[in-house]
Amino acid sequence: MPSSITSKLDKFRCMKRSISEINLDPLQRGGILTPEARAALVEWGDGYSVCDFCEGMLDRVRNPPVEEFVHEILPRFLDVDDVRITHGAREGMYAAMHSLCDAGDYIVADGNAHYTTVLAAERAGLEISYVENSGEPEYTINPEGYREAIRDAADQGYRVSMAVLTYPDGNYGNLVDARRVAEICHEEGVPLLLNGAYSIGRMPVSARELDADIVVGSGHKSMASSGPIGVLGAKQEYADIIFRRSKSKKNKEVELLGCTVRGAGLLTMMASFPHVLERVGRWQEEVDKARWFSSELEELGIEQQGEKPHNHDLMFFKSERLYEISKSARKGRYFLYHELKDRGICGIKPGLTRQFKLSTYLIPREDLERVVSAFHEIIEMGSRVEAE
């Protein structure tokens, strides 16, 4: 290898991560590893380590007990007929769309859908009709909008072969009435896919109770797993199609390209699962804590957007006050990031002051009190500087 390249490689040998005491990042709160998962990460970190006793199908490996986890534990946890491990929620969505829809079909999705819903549909050759949100400040989705969107597309001669609901959405943390959406979709003859990337592993989600036909979840977002990893569950009538086997490679499932996560991601998910199951049972505590935190910030003039009272730990805030302070602050629009970092707080993206999102998930009340105090100090400091 040329010396011009090898001379640059030392930086890759021992990479470190800088993180503050309190991390508010919604992407990361639900994916923080348990001590058991960190131990599994070391034990099973080698590539293909899970395949010591594999007979050709990842989900049928018995040592470690992958088969039991995938075919017994996860279906009971999600309350769904059949489950597989994927590389993430997006891969699960694509597998479902590609197998259940035909190129040129339409899907109906909520207007708050994650960008990966759009990309999965595009990759599968599908068009999208949106159920628009209500706009500022709540950005809610009306379940009846699904009926309108399905019928509008059908009236134009298009086949609607799937509906997608983001539960909750990744911007505002809104939880739509999923059971009502499912009821409407089924009345119109359309299966519903529930994107639970921010719910499965944080809060109770029963596919059967919600009557969702397909559910996808994210291990690295919400199941205390190292990424990338996700789960894909389906009712039997759809599972038979999504998880169909190859005609030529009889023990390989086509949509999953045979085997998916073959090492650390899967074993960290399994090692964390007892903790994940326990924390799901304490979900109401997390909701109460999020509502308290929102009310405290609103007293400082930082306004929570989305549903109120809020029903999820992910929240979106707007603050004209912080934005005005940023105009004269020495570090400009990056001032909030640095002020919080100086106080041991991270997770709000650098450069954001006027609007930002955060999560209170699994953060102790006393740490959230520190965050509230930090915002109070920052606003007071900015006001004094402006007065001078």
Swiss-Prot record:
Obligatory cofactor(s): pyridoxal 5'-phosphate
Gene3D superfamilies, per database record: Aspartate Aminotransferase, domain 1, Type I PLP-dependent aspartate aminotransferase-like (Major domain)
Binding site for pyridoxal 5'-phosphate: 89-90, 195, 218-220
Enzyme class, broadest EC rank: transferase
Coiled coil: none
List of residues that carry N6-(pyridoxal phosphate)lysine: 221
Transferase is among the record's keywords: yes
Protein purpose: Converts O-phospho-L-seryl-tRNA(Cys) (Sep-tRNA(Cys)) to L-cysteinyl-tRNA(Cys) (Cys-tRNA(Cys)).
HAMAP family found in the cross-reference section: Sep_Cys_tRNA_synth
Listed name of the protein: O-phospho-L-seryl-tRNA:Cys-tRNA synthase
Lineage: Archaea, Methanobacteriati, Methanobacteriota, Stenosarchaea group, Methanomicrobia
